[in-house]
Amino acid sequence: MLNKEIGSDKKEESFFRSAFQKLKRIERPEKDKQKVPRDRSKLIAVTLWSCVGSLLFICLLAVLLSINTRSQLNDMKDETNKPTNDDKQKISVTAAENFLSGFINEYMNVKNDQESIEKRMQSLESYMVKQEDNHFEDEERFNVDGLKGDRELKGYSLYNVKEGDKNSLFQYKVTYENLYPVEKEVEKEVKDGKKKKKVKEKVKTNEKYEKQMLLNIPVTNKGDSFAVSAVPYFTQIYDLKGDIAFKGKEETRDEYAGEKKESIESFLQNFFEKYASEKKEEMVYMMKKPEALEGNLLFGEVQSVKIFETKKGFEVFCAVRFKEKENDIPVNEKFSLEITENSGQFYVNKLKHQ
C-alpha cells in the first residue's frame, strides 16, 4: 500500500516536471516598447529662422557687391576718360613749330610807332588761349608803351621742348638786335669868316646791340589745334651738354685663344677692307645683312680685337680705323660681329655699330 502511494507521488512529480519543461519551451512574445514621440517643433523653428536669416544675409551681400562693382566700373570709366601722360606727350613738335613761327616773328619784331604797336597786339592775341573772363591785364599783356627804340629778330631755332601737366614749354634760341637812339657829341668844322673852326655839336644816332636769349613759350593743344597759354618770357641759354657716365657691361668670359684665332683676325682684316671699298651688293657672300661704305672712306687698320667662343661660332669686338680719302682724316669706329664658320669659311651673321 505504501509502495502504491510512493509510485503515485512520483507520477505526479514527473507530470509537473514535464509540464514545466513544456511551458519553458513556449516563447513569450516580447512586449512592444511604446516610444514616446519627441517634440521637434523647436528644431524646425530654429532651422526655418536660420534659413530666413541666411537668405537675408545673402541678399544684403549681393546688394553691397553690386554697389561696389558699379563704383569700380565708374572709377574705371573716369580713369579711361582722363588724359594720360602718354596722350599729353603726343603733341606734334613739327606742327607746333609751324604754328609758332608766325607768333615768334610777331612777338620779337617791335617797331616804335603806334600803328605798328596796335597791329602787333591784335596779331599776338589771335594766338592766345581764349579766356571766358577777359581780365584787364590780359588786354594789356602785349602793350609796349614807353619804348624808346625798335627790336629786330635776326634768327631763331628750337632749343628744347619740356612737357608739363597742362602745357608744353617750347624754348627757342633767338638772336635779335635792339635799336635805340643815342645822343652823341661830335666835332664839326664850320666857317668862321675866312677861317674854319671846330665846334662841338650834339647829334642823335641809332645804336645796335645784338643779344641771344632763350624765348620760352607755353603751348597747349587739342589734337592738331594749338594756342599759346601764357605770355612768353626770356631766360639765359643753358648748356645741354651733361656729365653723363655710362657703365659698360663687364666682360667675365675668357677670350678665345684657340687655333682659329689667327684665321679670324685675318678674316676681319679682309672683311673690313671689302666693307670700305666694295658696293653693298658685293658683300652678300660675306655677311647676312649686307652694308658697305662703297669707297667713301678708306680702310686703315683693325685694332684691339677681342674674340669669344659661343655655341654657334664666335663673337668678336673690335675697333676699326678708317680715313677720309681726300685728306687722311682718321675716322674711328667700334663694331661687334657674330661670326660662324662653314667649311673653313667665316661668315658674318650680325654686324653692330657700337
Curated annotation (Swiss-Prot):
GO CC annotations, alphabetized: plasma membrane
Signal peptide: none
Transmembrane intervals: 43-63
Keywords linked to the UniProt accession: Cell membrane, Membrane, Transmembrane, Transmembrane helix
Localization annotation: Cell membrane
Membrane topology per record: Single-pass membrane protein
Name of the protein in question: Uncharacterized protein YddB
Organism: Bacillus subtilis (strain 168)
